[in-house]
Curated annotation (Swiss-Prot):
It is found in: Cytoplasm, Nucleoid. One of its GO terms (cellular component) is bacterial nucleoid. This is Nucleoid-associated protein YejK. Disulfide bonds: none annotated. It comes from Salmonella arizonae (strain ATCC BAA-731 / CDC346-86 / RSK2980). Belongs to the YejK family. It holds the Pfam family NA37. It comes from the Bacteria. Keywords: Cytoplasm. GO terms for molecular function: double-stranded DNA binding; single-stranded RNA binding.
Length: 335
């Protein structure tokens, strides 16, 4: 992995009681040793693989103002990180659920792009077996479950300040209030809505195949083709590009897919991040509620699975063997 650390600082917030978070600040930057580089590379890998929301700094963002001064050389990175950790502590004390953690600020370069990564990591206790096969206590950073993380694409921020996607952050699993406090600390608001872009793409694909008057099998083949392209981009950590997707679909219609989306007003960006959960709808139907969960391949609709919209009834012909076995045992006396 071609990752180069420019500067990295660690500080700590320790929760002493419900009202107080103790601030522990380092007096020097971390040296980018092999271990430190490995840790940042792992954090970069884990973060890149997760679904993220996109944002931009508000005009009054204190963090953005301080970062701008630091980038201009008016403040060193350590002082910037110490002051920012203090602001984070002040923001956290507003919330009764707030916990402490290791606060990381890392300025690094990956594939010719400069980033600032900000994270709050849990420092967990565990056990290790030493060379004498004795068990000793140890501590480790819980990188795999890190959920309070944001990353600023410094290159994008400085070269394209009107962008709505230079700031990314994790959102959802940690709960709305946690996401709120971190956004308040960053002084940021949501920008590009990746889910909305992906939903628009799915609708455009369906409309595109309908206008081309494709039959059911042909439409499903196009959906699988789009899914394959988008999934490859997702796995590679790259964005969906309308022009390259249009080339993939060049045989569907005389009108290119990119021209179609522009003419019909879908308001899709030239490129946008792939959203895994939304893209699954290209090949599967899934839903849950009221104690019922259903998930099946899209190609089965109209063949083994039939939906009557008038009565909102789903009819399944041929149940999976393991489900059929459970039903038979339960209805024959519960044996």
């Amino acid at each position: 992995m071609s990752l180069d650390i420019n500067q990295i600082a660690l500080h700590q917030l320790i929760k002493r009681d419900e009202q107080n978070l103790e601030l522990v600040l380092r007096d020097s930057l971390l040296e980018p040793t092999a271990t430190v580089v490995e840790m940042v590379a792992e954090l970069h890998r884990v973060y890149s693989a997760k679904n993220k929301a996109y944002g931009l700094f508000n005009e009054e963002s204190e963090l953005a103002q301080a970062l701008r001064l630091q980038r201009q050389g008016e403040e060193d990175f350590l002082a910037f990180s110490r002051a920012a950790t203090g602001r984070l502590r002040d923001e956290l004390t507003k919330y009764p659920f707030a916990d402490g953690g290791i606060v990381l600020f890392c300025h690094y370069r990956y594939l010719a792009v400069e980033y600032l990564l900000v994270a709050v990591l849990n420092n967990l206790s565990s056990m290790r077996v030493n060379e004498n096969l004795d068990i000793n206590p140890t501590h480790y950073l819980d990188i795999n479950h890190a959920d309070i993380v944001a990353r600023i694409d410094l290159t994008e921020w400085e070269t394209n300040p009107e962008s709505t996607r230079y700031l990314t952050f994790l959102k959802g699993r940690v709960g709305r209030k946690v996401a709120d406090f971190f956004m308040d600390f960053l002084g940021a608001s949501e920008g590009l809505n990746a889910k909305a872009q992906n939903r628009g793409l799915l609708q455009a694909v369906d409309d595109f195949t309908a206008e081309a008057q494709l039959d059911k099998a042909e439409r499903q083949n196009v959906r699988r083709q789009v899914y394959s392209y988008c999934n490859e981009r997702l796995q590679a950590g790259e964005e969906i590009e309308l022009e390259s997707l249009s080339k993939e679909l060049s045989c569907v219609s005389e009108v290119s897919f990119s021209e179609f989306t522009a003419e019909k007003g879908y308001e899709l960006e030239e490129s946008f991040p792939a959203d895994r959960s939304t893209l699954r709808q290209l090949t599967k139907y899934a839903g849950s509620g009221g104690g019922l969960t259903i998930n099946f391949d899209a190609m089965l609709l109209g063949e083994r699975i039939f939906w009557d919209p008038a009565t909102d009834t789903l009819t399944i012909k041929g149940t999976p063997p393991n489900l059929r076995d459970q039903l038979q045992r339960r209805t024959s006396g519960g044996k």
